[in-house]
Protein backbone atom coordinates (compact mmCIF):
# COMPACT_ATOMS: atom_id res chain seq x y z
CA UNK A 1 0.00 0.00 0.00
CA UNK A 2 1.45 3.34 -1.04
CA UNK A 3 2.29 6.14 1.36
CA UNK A 4 2.30 9.82 0.45
CA UNK A 5 5.44 11.77 1.31
CA UNK A 6 5.47 15.51 1.91
CA UNK A 7 7.11 17.14 -1.15
CA UNK A 8 9.05 19.60 1.00
CA UNK A 9 10.29 17.12 3.60
CA UNK A 10 11.20 14.63 0.88
CA UNK A 11 13.62 17.14 -0.70
CA UNK A 12 14.89 18.72 2.52
CA UNK A 13 18.66 19.01 2.30
CA UNK A 14 18.67 18.19 -1.42
CA UNK A 15 17.21 21.31 -3.02
CA UNK A 16 15.15 22.70 -0.13
CA UNK A 17 16.50 24.56 2.87
CA UNK A 18 15.35 24.39 6.48
CA UNK A 19 12.73 26.96 7.48
CA UNK A 20 13.79 26.82 11.12
CA UNK A 21 17.54 27.23 11.69
CA UNK A 22 18.72 26.67 15.24
CA UNK A 23 20.32 24.05 17.43
CA UNK A 24 19.32 23.13 20.97
CA UNK A 25 20.15 20.31 23.33
CA UNK A 26 17.82 20.12 26.29
CA UNK A 27 15.77 23.13 25.13
CA UNK A 28 14.72 21.46 21.87
CA UNK A 29 11.10 20.93 22.92
CA UNK A 30 10.73 24.48 24.20
CA UNK A 31 12.20 25.96 21.01
CA UNK A 32 9.89 23.83 18.91
CA UNK A 33 6.83 24.97 20.86
CA UNK A 34 7.97 28.59 20.56
CA UNK A 35 8.31 28.20 16.79
CA UNK A 36 4.79 26.79 16.55
CA UNK A 37 3.49 29.68 18.65
CA UNK A 38 5.20 32.25 16.44
CA UNK A 39 3.82 30.67 13.28
CA UNK A 40 0.30 30.60 14.72
CA UNK A 41 0.52 34.26 15.70
CA UNK A 42 1.65 35.19 12.19
CA UNK A 43 -1.13 33.12 10.64
CA UNK A 44 -3.72 34.74 12.91
CA UNK A 45 -2.52 38.35 12.72
CA UNK A 46 -1.50 38.45 9.02
CA UNK A 47 -4.68 37.18 7.39
CA UNK A 48 -4.74 39.86 4.68
CA UNK A 49 -0.98 40.00 4.24
CA UNK A 50 -0.74 36.92 1.98
CA UNK A 51 2.20 35.39 3.84
CA UNK A 52 3.62 32.54 1.77
CA UNK A 53 6.47 31.43 4.05
CA UNK A 54 7.90 32.03 7.50
CA UNK A 55 11.59 31.44 8.23
CA UNK A 56 12.85 31.35 11.82
CA UNK A 57 16.48 31.62 12.89
CA UNK A 58 17.75 31.77 16.47
CA UNK A 59 20.99 33.37 17.60
CA UNK A 60 21.50 33.69 21.33
CA UNK A 61 18.49 35.37 22.92
CA UNK A 62 17.27 36.88 19.65
CA UNK A 63 14.89 35.37 17.12
CA UNK A 64 15.17 36.45 13.48
CA UNK A 65 11.81 36.11 11.76
CA UNK A 66 11.52 36.52 7.97
CA UNK A 67 8.09 36.79 6.37
CA UNK A 68 7.66 36.31 2.61
CA UNK A 69 4.51 38.17 1.63
CA UNK A 70 2.73 39.05 -1.60
CA UNK A 71 1.34 42.19 0.07
CA UNK A 72 4.16 43.68 2.12
CA UNK A 73 2.48 47.08 2.24
CA UNK A 74 -0.41 45.67 4.26
CA UNK A 75 1.97 44.02 6.72
CA UNK A 76 4.05 47.18 7.13
CA UNK A 77 1.12 49.57 7.40
CA UNK A 78 1.17 53.35 7.42
CA UNK A 79 4.35 54.49 9.08
CA UNK A 80 5.17 50.93 10.10
CA UNK A 81 2.31 50.68 12.60
CA UNK A 82 1.32 47.15 11.63
CA UNK A 83 4.90 45.89 11.83
CA UNK A 84 5.37 47.29 15.33
CA UNK A 85 2.06 45.81 16.49
CA UNK A 86 2.95 42.42 15.02
CA UNK A 87 6.41 42.56 16.58
CA UNK A 88 4.98 43.32 20.03
CA UNK A 89 2.48 40.47 19.71
CA UNK A 90 5.24 38.05 18.74
CA UNK A 91 7.47 39.16 21.61
CA UNK A 92 4.65 38.86 24.14
CA UNK A 93 3.75 35.38 22.85
CA UNK A 94 7.30 33.99 22.86
CA UNK A 95 9.06 36.10 25.47
CA UNK A 96 12.08 36.57 23.18
CA UNK A 97 13.44 39.58 21.33
CA UNK A 98 12.16 39.47 17.75
CA UNK A 99 14.01 40.78 14.70
CA UNK A 100 11.33 41.01 12.02
CA UNK A 101 12.07 41.18 8.28
CA UNK A 102 9.49 41.32 5.49
CA UNK A 103 10.33 40.33 1.93
CA UNK A 104 8.13 40.62 -1.12
CA UNK A 105 7.04 37.65 -3.23
CA UNK A 106 7.33 38.56 -6.91
CA UNK A 107 4.91 35.96 -8.30
CA UNK A 108 2.15 34.95 -5.85
CA UNK A 109 0.73 32.59 -8.48
CA UNK A 110 3.81 30.38 -8.06
CA UNK A 111 3.38 30.01 -4.28
CA UNK A 112 1.35 26.88 -3.57
CA UNK A 113 0.13 28.07 -0.17
CA UNK A 114 -1.19 31.34 -1.58
CA UNK A 115 -2.90 29.52 -4.45
CA UNK A 116 -4.53 27.08 -2.03
CA UNK A 117 -5.75 29.92 0.19
CA UNK A 118 -7.10 31.76 -2.84
CA UNK A 119 -9.11 28.71 -3.91
CA UNK A 120 -10.36 28.20 -0.36
CA UNK A 121 -11.49 31.82 -0.21
CA UNK A 122 -13.38 31.48 -3.46
CA UNK A 123 -15.07 28.31 -2.22
CA UNK A 124 -16.18 30.20 0.88
CA UNK A 125 -17.64 32.86 -1.44
CA UNK A 126 -19.74 30.11 -3.07
CA UNK A 127 -17.85 30.12 -6.36
CA UNK A 128 -18.23 26.76 -8.21
CA UNK A 129 -15.27 24.59 -7.25
CA UNK A 130 -14.43 23.51 -10.80
CA UNK A 131 -14.26 27.10 -11.98
CA UNK A 132 -12.09 28.13 -9.02
CA UNK A 133 -9.68 25.23 -9.57
CA UNK A 134 -9.37 25.71 -13.34
CA UNK A 135 -8.89 29.47 -13.12
CA UNK A 136 -6.19 29.07 -10.47
CA UNK A 137 -4.41 26.44 -12.56
CA UNK A 138 -4.62 28.64 -15.67
CA UNK A 139 -3.14 31.68 -13.89
CA UNK A 140 -0.30 29.62 -12.44
CA UNK A 141 0.62 28.13 -15.81
CA UNK A 142 0.48 31.57 -17.44
CA UNK A 143 3.09 32.92 -15.01
CA UNK A 144 5.59 30.23 -15.99
CA UNK A 145 5.01 27.10 -13.95
CA UNK A 146 5.78 23.79 -15.64
CA UNK A 147 2.98 21.92 -13.91
CA UNK A 148 0.28 22.19 -11.29
CA UNK A 149 -1.97 19.78 -9.45
CA UNK A 150 -4.98 20.91 -7.41
CA UNK A 151 -7.01 18.58 -5.21
CA UNK A 152 -10.20 19.47 -3.35
CA UNK A 153 -11.88 17.09 -0.94
CA UNK A 154 -15.15 17.45 0.96
CA UNK A 155 -18.83 18.03 0.30
CA UNK A 156 -18.21 19.68 -3.05
CA UNK A 157 -21.24 21.32 -4.58
CA UNK A 158 -23.28 20.73 -1.43
CA UNK A 159 -23.60 16.97 -1.93
CA UNK A 160 -24.19 14.74 1.07
CA UNK A 161 -21.30 12.41 0.25
CA UNK A 162 -17.75 13.75 0.32
CA UNK A 163 -15.65 13.26 -2.80
CA UNK A 164 -12.35 14.27 -4.33
CA UNK A 165 -11.87 16.43 -7.42
CA UNK A 166 -8.46 16.90 -9.05
CA UNK A 167 -7.21 19.26 -11.75
CA UNK A 168 -3.84 18.64 -13.43
CA UNK A 169 -1.98 20.71 -15.98
CA UNK A 170 1.56 20.21 -17.23
CA UNK A 171 4.11 17.92 -15.57
CA UNK A 172 4.28 16.81 -11.94
CA UNK A 173 7.35 14.58 -11.27
CA UNK A 174 6.81 13.90 -7.56
CA UNK A 175 9.43 11.11 -7.46
CA UNK A 176 12.29 13.21 -8.87
CA UNK A 177 14.43 14.71 -6.11
CA UNK A 178 15.85 17.57 -8.17
CA UNK A 179 12.36 18.76 -9.09
CA UNK A 180 11.47 22.09 -7.47
CA UNK A 181 7.95 21.36 -6.22
CA UNK A 182 6.06 23.67 -3.90
CA UNK A 183 3.20 22.35 -1.77
CA UNK A 184 0.40 24.15 0.03
CA UNK A 185 -2.62 23.17 2.11
CA UNK A 186 -5.64 25.31 3.00
CA UNK A 187 -9.12 24.80 4.41
CA UNK A 188 -12.40 26.30 3.26
CA UNK A 189 -15.05 26.67 5.98
CA UNK A 190 -18.38 26.52 4.15
CA UNK A 191 -21.98 26.04 5.27
CA UNK A 192 -21.81 22.43 4.09
CA UNK A 193 -18.70 21.64 6.09
CA UNK A 194 -14.95 21.75 5.77
CA UNK A 195 -13.30 21.44 2.35
CA UNK A 196 -9.59 20.71 2.08
CA UNK A 197 -7.53 22.22 -0.74
CA UNK A 198 -4.09 20.86 -1.69
CA UNK A 199 -1.87 22.42 -4.34
CA UNK A 200 1.36 21.15 -5.92
CA UNK A 201 3.32 23.47 -8.24
CA UNK A 202 6.24 22.25 -10.35
CA UNK A 203 8.66 25.11 -11.07
CA UNK A 204 11.39 23.18 -12.88
CA UNK A 205 14.52 21.25 -11.95
CA UNK A 206 17.30 22.39 -9.64
CA UNK A 207 20.58 20.91 -10.87
CA UNK A 208 23.31 21.05 -8.21
CA UNK A 209 26.60 22.67 -9.16
CA UNK A 210 28.57 19.74 -7.73
CA UNK A 211 27.71 17.60 -10.72
CA UNK A 212 29.04 20.23 -13.12
CA UNK A 213 32.34 20.58 -11.24
CA UNK A 214 32.78 16.81 -11.06
CA UNK A 215 32.11 16.52 -14.78
CA UNK A 216 34.68 19.21 -15.58
CA UNK A 217 37.19 17.49 -13.29
CA UNK A 218 36.69 14.20 -15.10
CA UNK A 219 37.19 15.83 -18.50
CA UNK A 220 40.37 17.55 -17.30
CA UNK A 221 41.73 14.25 -15.99
CA UNK A 222 41.00 12.57 -19.31
CA UNK A 223 42.73 15.37 -21.23
CA UNK A 224 45.81 15.22 -18.96
CA UNK A 225 46.10 11.45 -19.32
CA UNK A 226 45.83 11.78 -23.09
Predicted regions and their residues:
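RNA-contacting regions in translation and RNA-metabolism proteins
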Residues: 1-226
Amino acid sequence: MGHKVHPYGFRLGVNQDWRAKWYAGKNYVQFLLDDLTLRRVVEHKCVGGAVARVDIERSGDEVYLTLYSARPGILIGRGGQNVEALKSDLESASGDKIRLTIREVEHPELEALLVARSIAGRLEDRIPFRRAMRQAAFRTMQVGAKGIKIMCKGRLGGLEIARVETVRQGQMPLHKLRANIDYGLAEAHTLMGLIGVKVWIYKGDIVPEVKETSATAETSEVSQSA
